[in-house]
Amino acid sequence: MFDHPYLAMYQRLHEEFGLKVQLNLFYRMEDFDLSQVSEAYYDEWEANSDWLKLSFHSKLENVKPYESSDYDEVYEDCKRVHEQIKRFASSAALANTTTIHYCSLTEDGLKAMEDNRVFGLLGLFGSNQNPRTSYGIEESNAEKIRNGEI
């Protein structure tokens, strides 16, 4: 598995500096989906799961996929990716945090993530000069996040 240049780089950085990596996965891209991923590297994924994690990102790479999605859509898309990760890489390789594509979810989508045992959402909050907010967080709280207050 570490013959792949990106994974080899991550492994080298882990060995040299203790780097920990989380890869956020789309379920489908053009003519490929996660159900086609081989189980041949299962043992390697599991053996490296202390520093190399996989997580749900989105069903497809499209513009703001969950900005107005209901509970069922988000729940099923996340569940499908989680099932595939467990199949080809082990439960140990499944992260309990993620970054949703475009950092946007409805309240129902947030509940769907929690029900899929995702307990941390990583977002984009920008800087004080170029502020951003994620997951519908109020700007006042986003500012506190940027300043390290929460």
Q: What are these model-derived regions, one by one?
A:
Residues D31-F32, A92, Y102-I150:
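Active-site-adjacent pocket scaffolds in enzyme catalytic domains
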Residues K20-D108, Q129-T133:
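Metal-dependent polysaccharide deacetylase catalytic core of the NodB/CE4 family, i.e.
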Residues L13-H14, W45, M113:
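Generic structural signal for hydrophobic
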Residues D3-M9, D33-E46, E83, Y135-I150:
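Alpha-helical scaffolding within the catalytic cores
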Residues M1-E15, L19:
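N-terminal regions that are enriched for targeting/export leaders
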Residues G18, S49, E114-R117:
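Glycine-centered loop/turn motif at secondary-structure junctions
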